[in-house]
């Protein structure tokens, strides 16, 4: 079987370009499509600065150009995609427009990542230049470029791609050492876990796939904090969140609103925390039923590292670490008969709460234009349009998709709806003159997730635990949010069957409830904790525990428990069996500072249903 070799082929990763210009590094979907990539996220304005690099051609000859890309709108439209760009070789633009899509019989096939063929170039041995030139500012994307003398085309499957990468771009793994506690994911739960463990003396590795900390509460996603902290039975839990959480309420506000610097400053001040930002964990080494180490790939340079540890915590939200380690997970809705929950459906299904892709526009004094999405965008009219200036929580997509396998599609649909909505208001709305000076200021390209996989622990929290309530002897931090489940709006579902993008919340009140410790460690991976929305709960119970202040306190508990494990040479389950009093003592103390201003008074109760602020 013919294959590529470094003697006749040059492969260049887009994120490794010498100068990225105005292109954005996108690393959310490494586990689905095999790599981080460059995204032309210009929000409707073509990127001004190209991404450029210099390559070394090994020998004279004719080289065929291949570009790994995709047509991101092909899932929903047969029209010409706006996600197109050019590739320049030695300053000459290839005749092809890249990102136009794979040939296929279904929309899913046409929307897959593939190698698009360009022209053939006669190149001399030595240095040559490549450039990516965006054409629309609407999220064209490039993963890699190949120039080859070989008379074969690269395969499109993820398996073929991995083999190709290993052959042409082998990457050694740098060993970063052994830690007491390794945390994967630096959202609010991962941050609080790291801080709690570090302050009680554990050596912590905190691995985050993005360069910004905070997850959904970062300036990349912009979801406000919800839930209450500092509640009985352990009112000291939550002060860490008060240190790192923003002091302002609201979704989809300006970047400064989310005070990313507070999170980073506190983490960097902890001498026991080693922070690895931009790293996606993509592999584990097991020793029996214990995780021995994880490997991770960096988003921009795509170098690889290995991190070993004594205990680990999955704070990814998606249970990525758990799945790699072989832990049992759940996803979708459990049947009523499985746990006896009144709010569960009669039959189990794959439905989940969806993703919010936040955005907003602003009225300025200057007129502006925006590309008309009539050819490629969402089908909208005066009846279906939502002419708002801000997308809040109820702009929700992907409820019927696979939250893991379809993660990129779901995010893309959120952007697709945002662009289509704004384009309609600018170009076709009956009162479009009201939008003449309205600018689309910000559209997130990072998914604001609510639900995906949940890890099975020694106890699975159920609806009845929260509503009766049923207390447990190993209660820890307190959940206070009502059981808040989201469903597609009926009219939106009728207008866009299977592709809904508007939701409503269905609420069931609860009293404050202490989450059992047994929900915070995996049943079948001996040294793995979890904190955040991937803990051991049913779909129904997740409706309460998933909000970020509650997740943050879970992280604090897990950090304290990790310290007990490290100091007494235990595994997580051992704490429940024989050393829960040691954890209780630490939960009574908490790990947060009480000498900083207390700001977490806002949005302590669920305001689901309040939509007027966004119009």
Segments (PLM) and residue ranges:
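Conserved beta-strand elements of the Class I
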Residues: 180-182, 205, 529
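Conserved N-terminal/central alpha/beta ligand/cofactor-binding core
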Residues: 196, 202-203, 208-287, 330, ...
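Flavin (FAD/FMN)-binding glycine-rich loop and adjacent Rossmann-like elements that form
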Residues: 168-175, 216, 240, 278, ...
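Extracytoplasmic
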Residues: 2-170
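Beta1/beta-strand and adjacent pyrophosphate-binding region of the FAD-binding site
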Residues: 175-187
């Amino acid at each position: 079987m013919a294959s590529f070799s470094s003697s006749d082929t040059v492969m260049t990763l887009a994120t490794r370009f010498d100068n990225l210009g105005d292109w954005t590094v996108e690393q959310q979907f490494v586990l689905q499509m095999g790599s981080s990539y460059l995204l032309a996220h210009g929000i409707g304005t073509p990127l001004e600065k190209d991404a450029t690099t210099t390559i070394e051609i090994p020998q004279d000859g004719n080289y065929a150009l291949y570009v790994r890309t995709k047509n991101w709108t092909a899932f929903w439209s047969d029209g010409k995609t706006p996600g197109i760009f050019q590739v320049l070789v030695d300053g000459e633009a290839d005749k092809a427009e890249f990102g136009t899509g794979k040939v296929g019989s279904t929309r899913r096939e046409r929307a897959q990542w593939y190698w698009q063929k360009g022209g053939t170039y006669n190149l001399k041995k030595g240095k040559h230049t490549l450039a990516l030139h965006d054409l629309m500012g609407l999220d064209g994307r490039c993963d890699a470029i190949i120039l080859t003398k070989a008379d074969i085309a690269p395969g499109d499957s993820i398996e073929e791609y991995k083999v190709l990468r290993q052959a042409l771009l082998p990457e050694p793994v740098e060993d970063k050492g052994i830690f007491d506690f390794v945390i994967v994911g630096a959202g609010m739960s991962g941050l609080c876990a790291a801080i709690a463990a570090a302050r009680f003396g554990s050596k912590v590795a905190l691995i985050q796939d993005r360069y910004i900390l905070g997850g959904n509460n970062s300036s990349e996603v912009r979801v406000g904090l919800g839930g209450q902290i500092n509640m009985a039975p352990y009112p000291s839990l939550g002060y860490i969140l008060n240190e790192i959480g923003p002091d302002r309420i609201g979704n989809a506000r300006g970047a400064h609103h989310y005070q990313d610097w507070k999170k980073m400053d506190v983490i960097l001040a902890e001498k026991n925390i080693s922070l690895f930002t931009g790293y996606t964990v993509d592999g584990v080494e097991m020793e029996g039923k214990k995780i021995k180490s994880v490997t991770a790939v960096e988003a921009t340079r795509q170098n690889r590292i290995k991190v070993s540890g004594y205990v680990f915590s999955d704070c990814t939200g998606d249970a990525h670490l758990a799945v790699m380690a072989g832990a049992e997970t759940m996803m979708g809705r459990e049947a009523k008969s499985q746990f006896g929950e009144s709010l569960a459906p009669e039959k189990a299904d794959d439905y989940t709460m969806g993703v919010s892709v936040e955005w907003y526009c602003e009225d300025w004094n200057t007129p502006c234009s925006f590309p008309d999405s009539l050819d490629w965008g969402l089908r909208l009219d005066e009846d279906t349009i939502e002419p708002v200036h801000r997308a809040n929580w109820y702009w929700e997509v992907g409820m019927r998709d696979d939250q893991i396998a379809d993660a990129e599609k779901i995010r893309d649909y959120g952007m697709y709806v945002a662009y289509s909505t704004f384009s309609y208001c600018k170009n076709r709305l009956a009162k479009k003159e009201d939008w003449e000076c309205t600018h689309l200021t910000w559209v997130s390209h990072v998914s604001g997730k609510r639900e995906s996989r949940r890890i099975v622990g020694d106890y699975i929290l159920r609806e009845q635990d929260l509503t009766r309530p049923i207390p447990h002897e190993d209660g820890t931090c307190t959940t206070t949010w009502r059981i808040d489940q989201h469903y597609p709006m009926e009219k939106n579902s009728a207008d866009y069957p299977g592709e809904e993008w508007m939701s409503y919340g269905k609420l069931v009140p609860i009293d404050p409830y202490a989450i059992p410790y047994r929900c915070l460690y995996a049943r079948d991976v001996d040294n793995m904790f979890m904190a955040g929305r991937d803990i051991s709960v049913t779909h129904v119970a997740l409706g309460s525990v998933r909000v970020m202040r509650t997740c943050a306190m879970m992280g604090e508990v897990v950090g304290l428990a990790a310290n007990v494990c490290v100091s007494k040479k235990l595994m997580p389950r051992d704490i429940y069996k024989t050393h829960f009093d040691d954890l209780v003592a630490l939960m009574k103390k908490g790990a947060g500072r009480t000498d900083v201003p207390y700001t977490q008074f806002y949005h302590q109760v669920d305001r689901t249903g309040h939509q007027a602020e966004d119009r």
